[in-house]
Amino acid sequence: MKKLILAASIMALTACSAPQQEQINVMPEASLSSSNLVQGKTYTLTSKDVRAAQYVALVDSGRANIQPIHAKQNMRISLENAIAKQFESQGFRDSVNSENSVVLEIQEALVTVEHTIMENQMDGKVTLEVTAETPEGKLVKTFNGTATRTGALSASNDDIAMVLNDVIDLVLKEIANDQELQTYMKERF
């Protein structure tokens, strides 16, 4: 019995000291409007993450070793909160029982990093689909953002997070300033 307890204790301690997977901070910043487009129009916001994999970065160190890096925060919830703030700043109100709905679909959010001995190249890509639906119909729009950054030596997790957050913020700004989406929501919600 003592051996069993000792073995279980060793396994528990070993599991605690196992190296943790690297993670980066994903902090989307909502693009807020300075004035209301509407007053009190309601919608129901939902979101879904349809990415094939849940990591947000792939780091290729060139030694046939590709390492995925995940986000510390839940990507879907972070983006949903940012979109809700954007619409709120435009005068739309999120409600659980509205006949109008907005669906945010995360199709891609990834930074690929290639390291060589002397430099790194980071390519970020974010694709979000926004569907605004009313009883009379719906509008589906896809928003894309890309960025490329090169740097000396290897890229840190902070560098990777900066590229990803910058691309996400560009896409959020594009959504906030999209005239077709604004007009559809203003006239039909």
Can you say where each PLM-predicted feature lies in the sequence?
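A structural "domain/chain start" motif
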Residues: 16-77, 181-189
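Contiguous, function-dense segments enriched for cysteine-driven chemistry
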Residues: 43-44, 92, 127, 147, ...
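Surface-exposed short loop/turn segments
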Residues: 17-26, 90-140, 149-154
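Mid-chain, structured segments of secreted extracytoplasmic proteins
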Residues: 69-97, 104
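Sec-exported extracytoplasmic/periplasmic mature domains
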Residues: 84-92, 111, 172-181
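Short secondary-structure boundary motifs at beta->alpha junctions and helix caps
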Residues: 60-72, 138-177
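Sec-dependent bacterial lipoprotein signal peptides
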Residues: 1-16
